[in-house]
Amino acid sequence: MCQAEHQVHPSEQRIRVESPKMTASRRGFNLTSQTRAHPSSGGSTSSRYGNCQRTHLIINGRHVAISLLLLVGLCGGTAAGTPGSADTRCDAGQFQCRDGGCILQAKMCDGRGDCKDSSDELDCDYRLCRPPHWFPCAQPHGACLAAELMCNGIDNCPGGEDELNCPVRPGFRFGDTAHRMRSCSKYEFMCQQDRTCIPIDFMCDGRPDCTDKSDEVAGCKQAEITCPGEGHLCANGRCLRRKQWVCDGVDDCGDGSDERGCLNLCEPQKGKFLCRNRETCLTLSEVCDGHSDCSDGSDETDLCHSKPDCDAKKCALGAKCHMMPASGAECFCPKGFRLAKFEDKCEDVDECKEQDDLCSQGCENTSGGYRCVCDAGYLLDKDNRTCRAVVYGSKEQQPLLLYTTQMTIMGMHLREDNVRNHVYQVAGNLSKVIGVAYDGSHIYWTNIQNEAESIVKANGDGSNAEILLTSGLDAPEDLAVDWLTQNIYFSDNIMRHIAVCSNDGLNCAVLVTQDVHQPRSLAVWPQKGLMFWTDWGEKPMIGRASMDGSRSRPIVSDNIEWPNGIALDMHQQRIYWVDAKLGSVQTVRPDGTGRRTVLDGMLKHPYGLAIFEDQLYWSDWATKSVHACHKFSGKDHRILAKDRTIYAVHIYHPAKQPNSPHGCENATCSHLCLLAEPEIGGHSCACPDGMRLAPDHRRCMLMEKRQRLFIGLGQVLLEIEHTAFGRHQVSKSYTLPCLINEMVYNRINGSLIIADNDQRLILEFQPESHESNVLVRSNLGNVSALAFDHLSRNLYWADTERAVIEVLSLQTRHRALIRFFPGQEVPIGLTVMPAEGYLYVVLKAKRHSHIDKIPLSGKGEQVHVFEDDLGDDDIKLVTDYETQTIFWSDSDLGRISYSNYRVPHSQIFRGKLRRPYSLAMVHHDLFWNELGTPRIYWTHKSNMGPRKVIDIMEKDDPAAIMPYVPVATPNGIPLAASSPVGQESHPCQQQNGGCSHICVGEGPYHSICLCPAGFVYRDAGNRTCVEALDCEFRCHSGECLTMNHRCNGRRDCVDNSDEMNCDEEHRRKPKVLCSPNQFACHSGEQCVDKERRCDNRKDCHDHSDEQHCEKFDKSKKCHVHQHGCDNGKCVDSSLVCDGTNDCGDNSDELLCEATSRCEPGMFQCGSGSCIAGSWECDGRIDCSDGSDEHDKCVHRSCPPDMQRCLLGQCLDRSLVCDGHNDCGDKSDELNCGTDSSTMNISCAEDQYQCTSNLKICLPSTVRCNGTTECPRGEDEADCGDVCSIYEFKCRSGRECIRREFRCDGQKDCGDGSDELSCELEKGHHNQSQIQPWSTSSRSCRPHLFDCQDGECVDLSRVCNNFPDCTNGHDEGPKCATACRSASGRQVCQHKCRATPAGAVCSCFDGYRLDADQKSCLDIDECQEQQPCAQLCENTLGGYQCQCHADFMLRQDRVSCKSLQSGATLLFSSFNEVRNLSEQPVMLNVAWSANDSRITGFDLAMHRQMGYFSAEDEGIVYQIDLQTKVIVRALGLPAPTKLSVDWVTGNVYVLSGAQEIQACSFVGRMCGRIVHVKSPRHVKHLAVDGYHARIFYIVIRTEGYGQTSSEIHMARLDGSRRDMLLQRSESFMTALTTDPHQQLLYFVDQHMRTLERISYRLKTGPMRRPEIMLQKSNALMHPSGLSVYENNAFIVNLGSVEAVQCALYGSRICHKISINVLNAQDIVVAGRSRQPQKASHPCAHAHCHGLCLQADYGYECMCGNRLVAEGERCPHGSGNEVAVLGAVNSLELEHEHEQNGHFHWLMALFVLAAGSLIAGLGYMYYQYRQRGHTDLNINMHFQNPLATLGGTKAFLEHERAEAGVGFTTETGTVSSRGSNDTFTTTSATSSFAAQQFSVPNALQRLLRPRQSASGDPMAQELLLESPSRESKLHALDGGGAGGDGDGGRGVGRQVPDILVADMDDDAAKSAGQFGGNYAGNDANARFVS
């Protein structure tokens, strides 16, 4: 220990510093990593702070520069000084170098290295507090603030100068004006010059705190007036705040006036003499020395010489005699001694015992004095009293002060005197942080935010924060860390206990509850095994207990009011605390003795408290600052920091947490080891919640098995053990081969039953063995809920897609249909009550949802339990069997409700939630989550406790229980909970209840047997089921009858069940609409007799009576798939015999015997109705009894050539290991080897490398430029501008949030745009039919009654003779008479609700109140609501939906399903067209175009042909969809989008952006039908072949980059063009047609809308478009659009999802994962999309080229010309080219065949070239023989084969043979279309196109033309770039002539060149380069 002796005389005092026996370099000074050393290990001089490589500082991670400065300053280099130099302390005013040397402080940071190691010039910005990283407060030696604290709106400097000259903020004016106008509080003094505020205690304290020193001038004048009574006014005007500072031996006044006349300091026993006038204190040697030293001479009197004198005086041993002026000779003991009471001697005074403020830490008595000693880790300062913390081997270390402000944790380094303290933020963006602690490695804090109560642990810099625990916390106000065991102790103000947790938060235990009321602050003393706390509750006290919770007792309980902060000075063994009401700092010994007040009168509202060395530090709410003073006297009061309201204060230094042996070092506790007082053993073992100690007092045993919570995250299953007190963590996690959409716990075997809606299966997973097996894999739709009946061992599920509830017996694995909902209701929630024998189901209807009760067997009535006040979105159920309670979440209304399921009565459990979703009951706690968030909430099921939260997986979230993984969080996270296995018995448990298939419970003691679909009961006991082969109707009593016995009026069954439910349904007559024997024209405005239907005469104005007549049966006047009613009406056969009267005369429900009466190609349901044959076994229930999805349906698995993804889809093997995530879960890219050809390919730094093809390097600017350049569009991935349809796009464009977070009152977007325009977002809700009678401003929901006092009650409770309103306003005298008038007539036409104010009328469904509020009017739902997918017929009080000829109504009676089932979805992606099918989900490559980009495609389904274009190649291809073989190819300039006229087979192609060409692959030619002029261009086109219409979008580019859009319609021959729509500031990108309803759909990217416009014939096209979708994420960058079965399918560039949106009803959108980012076109491959005609005009026409549908039948075309029928087209006018290897065929034989053709054709070309040369030579010879001397040969060479790989070489060869040399432009050749225009296309692409036949090639190469002179020998050669004169002139060989020969030169036979422009006659240009040749082609001619 370090010690100092105090001896009697100052001259004899000696200072003795003993060898230190303490920890050397026990911890390096940091906040993240400390190195420990045992005290006995000695010190090390190799490093000043231990292992500095591991030293880190608690600096906010954003300020790296600050961190580095501090780190360098602390670590520096290794010590190079002499041994022991580190212990050297420099004098005041000196700087200590790192090598131990000392220099003057003034030389530090003066630009010169004065230290030998130049350490005085390091970290000067930090040391001198220089910008830009630091800001010095104005006070001398004031705080040094981190730059981040400047201008943060908070005065962190005491004078507020850190907030001066800041940018304008709300509430502040620029500059310091706002501060000058500030007013100081009553606790502050305002400086005169800058009007800053300082604490009033600093006024006139002898130290200037104002920059103008006005606090020591004017302040002193004020102090004379305001000096409190408990203070002392000095002679100089200063005010001492405490009288205790008077006569304490210290000159506090500065003029010595506080130390004058102090008897206690000037006593003879202390060797002093006080003059009589009390002005002077003399030493005894100055008394009676013959010289008067007192001014009054009182030190020299006659008694100084009196007798007896000292020579005669006998003194005690050790005493000395002095002559005294008042008494003569007296004996005095030396200083440090006093006269013994009973002995005549001087005895030693024990100063340490009598005065405990002599030494900073330890005090040892010595003979005649004392000496101060310091504990390990401290050195004695030069005052021989103060202990300073050090670490041996280095310089003094900086202690760290932490304080909390609720929102932040701040840090301050405490420095020596006259050095600034550095202040910075440790952790920010917090909420209600109160307590804080630090153990040298981690920082801990408590959060008391409501519903976010937690204890958090983080690194020293605030990073990597993790929540240790939330469970069991209510208000954890403070915490302390036991640095020996790392246990965390904390107080809980609401739970009223002191508790402890292990450092990981997993094991927690309550320690002290007795006499604990409102505990606040906490301090621990591990070496003594003690803890102390403050309690400000009913009995305020300072409490003490052993750290294991034993021996709890108060040590202070009197004269204490509001004790807050507590601190332990373990060196002096004293406890300090602050009392907020008394405004004091007090101290007491650990045993409750020695209580005294340190400081009072100067504290306003102290809260936190800490101690370090001789200083106390506390926070004060009133002054919003951290204060400090001396721990003994309370002097040296100062403010260290200002901030918001400051709570806890904590100081860390390694010396404050000394290491020492302890009882837990060798303990063998299984869970918790707690220190205790040595006298009771030093430690004890403790157990967490739910466990107890075993008899050996070491092990913990479970009292009951903990229940577990299961969480489904995609394919990951998390298992969490729930604890009521402690940390939740993932105990286990499993990766499953399925998606977890719904799950339920099987309490019988502990397995989880999971529904996967992607793979459409239900499987069982056993967590113990990790095994899974499939329970159900066929006939599944979208499973919305699972429920498990533990009594009968049955699994129930709800299927929204198939609208059924089904059951599966886990004993027999048979399934049965419980209930089918054929209307518009679908089950979305489900739970079972096995002991009651029924289940609760949530049914979602069109207009509302309701909760019903159904028997578990499905046999019995369906009771509506909860009808009102339910939302229309997700509703999930969970049951608490212990309390007979059902809970349900309502995501639409944002609340959780509950009810007793035996006595239903709905009550709200929790409201104002953000879309609650899944529920789970774990023990006594209810868990739930919210849509779109990765958080799980829970609270006690009694709803008495706070809401707790578990963050599953969130980036930078301390509450996350598993590491953040950058994957999308599922929108809805399913939950399930384990539950203990019950011992209940049930009949179904014994041999399956005697049932052959399925046993279902009917309560706890009864059961019933069910049969699977297609089975019937065999016996009368209904126990055994057999396959229904001949039993058409099974009586309830067991008999088997034929269907003609059903409802025949006779009793054929014993129980008469054959005649049950046979009454006709009441049906209101319709309004004056079309009669049943009339046909309703599709326009809805005309009726014609059915006799005129399909009579080849157009009677309807819209011609609909003559449409779709191919399958119209004139005998029954209905289509073949329809039933002809007796009244003449037609209904779809799918609605026959389904129990609903669709005909109106019930004729569709008569004669329902199961005889073979369905039309061919139809399937007969078990009920008797007929559906399309393709609907059988298609995975969707279409029969009302579900019989179409029977057990014989083959399970569809992946074909052999496909691979199954982990998510269950089937994937084309060609897409496996292609570098792209095609599965969506990346399972197709697992275990892929490295491609050696690409492994070493890298791009330049300024380039972007495509991941789908590493060989492609693009400029870096392609990244996120809005277009896709890579083959799979990965250059547009993660660009932040495309959000999912379930997300909202923030206005910034860089952020997406969940759509349900829009307008929820919380800003989730960084720019807050999600909370803008929320009133418009909410819109106007549909008005209820019940009008509220209240006029109160407080509005209740429509179905609620306003009590006019802010309360709302259900209308059903009004006028029920019981006052439900608190004020009784729901009952009144009018309740009995309100619904009838005085005459007795009913007031309301339909329904009446009596209220105290009168009648409230309402109407039946389908009606609305008239203006008189009494009568009801029919609603035209067809017009107002558009509820039907296709055709809608309004009826009284309702409507009926119908379908077009190729469709039939589904069981929902709203949507239409194609008779040709099995449609798939095709979409293009760069060079591929992919095919996505649904049952099962399969993705394969329909066809591939090698490396060429596919720019458009379409299908002709009935012909089974596909068509696609390749713009770069200039070719349109026809491909056989069955064989995937190219049939034919046509050459066109720059073809992009195309659309098929499926009637004739013609293809309409957008060519060159300004032309539309019609192409016939039969006629092998194309012709232009539309041409637009610049600056307009055609963007997209669509064809309706049935109605012979073409539609196209024209974009006009206007000024400043703005665009306008036009939609044009024309006949298919290009005639009768009409503009349907024109819109400015628009950019339409795609359109498609619905030929059945004659609707044109289009998307506008600029307006983000999907719209439609009718082109049905009327008086003209309807020109007003209807918006179907607007501002939806389904329309971010739409590039492709298709419509099928009244659903729109959309693809967006940059999105990996296609979108399917219903175009009727609610228009809900769903996503379809396609996993490519660059899909451009999308087409539904369904036959019904293209209705067929029985015949078409072109089938009988005689056109030799093109035959196009036209207004009057057809038109013939040759190229661009209309020609007469029969006229032949000239040779060479076709467009056909041959294709080699253009498309990837899956058949290798085809590839070999193509390669063989290529080599054969190349050989023919070589022969042709040779023949050509020979022929030309022969011609030239004949020509010369006839006497001609010049060569006049014109060659016209057309090149439709521009994409041939060897074309360029071929052309160069031909030019060489012709003697002509010219150069083509870079890598391109030109092709000429039939419209005489040119386009330049790539000649180096992998597409290889070639002349179709050699004769054709020769004919095209040498085509005779007539010259001006009529010379038949003239030939013409078409050249590239004919308009470029320089290049053409180069053909002349560069020769020049001046003799009039046109520049040819004399005697040279070089051809002249003639150029003719596109629109000019060549003759007009004659002589330009020579020659005189007429022509009209845009070409260049060689003229010899």
Curated annotation (Swiss-Prot):
Annotated membrane topology: Single-pass membrane protein
Annotated compartments: Cell membrane; Cytoplasm; Cytoplasm, Cell cortex; Cytoplasmic vesicle, Clathrin-coated vesicle membrane
Alphabetical UniProt keywords: Cell membrane, Cytoplasm, Cytoplasmic vesicle, Disulfide bond, EGF-like domain, Endocytosis, Endosome, Glycoprotein, Membrane, Phosphoprotein, Receptor, Repeat, Signal, Transmembrane, Transmembrane helix
Species: Drosophila melanogaster
Biased composition (Gly residues): 1932-1946
Biased composition (Basic and acidic residues): 1-19
Any single Gene Ontology cellular-component annotation: plasma membrane
The EGF-like domain, residue ranges: 306-343, 348-388, 1418-1453
Gene3D superfamilies referenced in this protein's UniProt entry, alphabetically: Laminin, Low-density Lipoprotein Receptor, TolB, C-terminal domain
Entry protein name: Vitellogenin receptor Yl
Keyword Glycoprotein: yes
Gene symbol of the encoding locus: yl
Skewed-composition ranges (Polar residues): 30-48
InterPro entries, sorted: 6-blade_b-propeller_TolB-like, cEGF, EGF-like_Ca-bd_dom, EGF-like_dom, EGF-type_Asp/Asn_hydroxyl_site, EGF_Ca-bd_CS, LDL_receptor-like_sf, LDLR-related
Ranges for domain LDL-receptor class A: 89-125, 128-167, 183-221, 226-263, 265-305, 1024-1063, 1073-1110, 1117-1153, 1157-1194, 1197-1233, 1242-1280, 1282-1319, 1339-1376
GO molecular function: calcium ion binding; vitellogenin receptor activity
Single Gene Ontology BP annotation: endocytosis
Traits of the deletion mutant: Disruption of vitellogenesis resulting in failure of oocytes to take up yolk proteins and form yolk granules. Oocytes complete oogenesis without morphological abnormalities but eggs are shrivelled and do not hatch.
